[in-house]
């Protein structure tokens, strides 16, 4: 782990920068989102989208996906070497929705990737601006986190579907860099490592030769990223064991699953950032806002303020509830899929309900869905208060590892207890404490047994009025301590499958 002196904030990771002071960070993050906004405005001109169509979140997602696809070097190379029927490796596109005679029409567009790259670079002072691309990836990832359950993926790797609160960022592409690694949950990292180990078990050449050497480096790097998320010495020591294993196999998979379970109570530090759809930045740029001059932060008041003044629309299917669609997007914008619903509801100023009670499907519309019956409505993305985002995991100081309900990875730095079903979690830890990691396992189990669901996390931290931009008067909410609020609890959400 880098020593404290060289640790970069996640804005620095986000913008690929070295250590900067707060003003420089705000400026470089501002430059990044401003570039996204300028690109979006230009794309709306290219595609002849009117104001309303440009504010449609489905159009925003198509445009975002086009630029991500245009810059996906590895996939572009693969497509050129493996020409498949009907896929032009040099082109990218997707559905654009336009309003015609009071109805929504779907129009499939196709663009040259190099043309898209040209527009993107032009909007970003001639640079590739990989930070902006990563930012868009994280927004898509946060949207997936709020929309889908990863039960099937968890079960496939031998994990328990109730560990879904550890799965933040599970759909992020590998190329998402340091900013992407910062927002990945413990479960996501464990799952990536298990997949890798399984390949090594099934394919004996996986760790061999020149390629195997690169694979090994990637494996150790992922282990280090995961180790850096853990906050207790025993968990980190177990990660060292996994990383140093000569020939990773089932013992390592066991250790990793054990660690993932332990993270339900001894939570890892996972970053949270508000990444908004490109059209939101586009709206601000079009109205003359200068992000770079004003500065911007992904973890403070700025995204809340931006959403207070942005009107974004969404297509709505016939039996969907627009308020529920709004909740889904609000959660995605604030990276709050795994936050306690009591906290989210308080900040939003409207009840945030569990996924299973939402009458809405995902935001994206499949190509075979009937447009005749599609309507559109305004997304309500405003909030009553704002709060600072956290990456601490909310562990209380006395044990640096506190109570965490099956299913909370706190997003906001707001005082509350983190209720959890100790019986449910501890049941998973019966027996197996032998083998080379026995002392660490025993130590981890002891810490978990000492964690109390009523312990208060984020002591003294509160939410702020939207007029309080300097965060001077924290309002500390009081929550019903017994009532837990988990979003995917008892759920029937759709699966995310690529």
Swiss-Prot record:
Modification after translation, per record: Late in virus-infected cells, may be cleaved from a 56-kDa protein to a 53-kDa protein by a cellular caspase. This cleavage might be a marker for the onset of apoptosis in infected cells or have a specific function in virus host interaction.
Keywords: Capsid protein, Helical capsid protein, Host nucleus, Host-virus interaction, Ribonucleoprotein, RNA-binding, Viral nucleoprotein, Viral penetration into host nucleus, Virion, Virus entry into host cell
UniProt main location, coarse: virion
UniProt-annotated location(s): Virion; Host nucleus
Region of interest (Disordered), ranges: 1-21
Top-level taxon of origin: Viruses
Keyword Ribonucleoprotein: yes
Pfam families (UniProt xref): Flu_NP
InterPro entries assigned to the protein according to its UniProt record, in alphabetical order: Flu_NP
Record protein name field: Nucleoprotein
Organism of origin: Influenza A virus (strain A/Gull/Maryland/5/1977 H11N9)
Gene name of the record: NP
């Amino acid at each position: 782990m880098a020593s404290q002196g060289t640790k970069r904030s996640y804005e620095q990771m986000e913008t690929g920068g070295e250590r900067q002071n707060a003003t420089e960070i705000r400026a470089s993050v501002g430059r990044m989102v401003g570039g996204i906004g300028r690109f979006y405005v230009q794309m709306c001109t290219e595609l002849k989208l009117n104001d309303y169509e440009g504010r449609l979140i489905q159009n925003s997602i198509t445009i975002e996906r086009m630029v991500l696809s245009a810059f996906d070097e590895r996939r572009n190379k693969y497509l050129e070497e493996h020409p498949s029927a009907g896929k032009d490796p040099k082109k990218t596109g997707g559905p654009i929705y336009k309003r015609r005679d009071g109805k929504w029409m779907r129009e499939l567009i196709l663009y040259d990737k190099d043309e898209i790259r040209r527009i993107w670079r032009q909007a970003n002072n001639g640079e590739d601006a990989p930070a902006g691309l990563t930012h868009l990836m994280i927004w898509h990832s946060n949207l997936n986190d709020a929309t889908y359950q990863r039960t099937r993926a968890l079960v496939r790797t031998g994990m328990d579907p109730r560990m879904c609160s550890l799965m933040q960022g599970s759909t992020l592409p590998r190329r998402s860099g340091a900013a992407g690694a910062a927002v990945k949950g413990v479960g996501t990292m464990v799952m990536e490592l298990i997949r890798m180990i399984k390949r090594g078990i099934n394919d004996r050449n996986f760790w061999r030769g020149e390629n195997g050497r690169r694979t090994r480096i990637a494996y150790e790097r992922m282990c280090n990223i995961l180790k850096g998320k853990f906050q207790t010495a025993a968990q980190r020591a177990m990660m060292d064991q996994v990383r140093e294993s000569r020939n990773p196999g089932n013992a390592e998979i066991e250790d990793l699953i054990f660690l993932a379970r332990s993270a339900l109570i001894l939570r890892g530090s996972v970053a949270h950032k508000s990444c908004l759809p490109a059209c939101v930045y586009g709206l601000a740029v079009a109205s003359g806002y200068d992000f770079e001059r004003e500065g911007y932060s992904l973890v403070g008041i700025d995204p809340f303020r931006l959403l207070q003044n942005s009107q974004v629309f969404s297509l709505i299917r016939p039996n969907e509830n627009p308020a529920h669609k709004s909740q889904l997007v609000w959660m995605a914008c604030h990276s709050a899929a795994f936050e306690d619903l009591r906290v989210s509801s308080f900040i939003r100023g409207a009840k945030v309900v569990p996924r299973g009670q939402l009458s809405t499907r995902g935001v994206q519309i499949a190509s075979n869905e009937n447009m005749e019956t599609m309507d559109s409505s305004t997304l309500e993305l405003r909030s009553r208060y704002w709060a600072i985002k956290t990456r601490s995991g909310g562990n209380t100081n006395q044990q640096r590892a506190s109570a965490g309900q099956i299913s909370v990875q706190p997003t906001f730095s707001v005082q509350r207890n983190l209720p959890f079903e100790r019986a449910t979690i501890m049941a998973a830890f019966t027996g197996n404490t032998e083998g080379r990691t026995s002392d660490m396992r025993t130590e981890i189990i002891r810490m978990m047994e000492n964690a109390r669901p009523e312990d208060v996390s984020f002591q003294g931290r509160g939410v702020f009025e939207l007029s309080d931009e300097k965060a001077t008067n924290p309002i500390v909410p009081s929550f019903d301590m017994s009532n837990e609020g988990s979003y995917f609890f008892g759920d029937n959400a759709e699966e995310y499958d690529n």
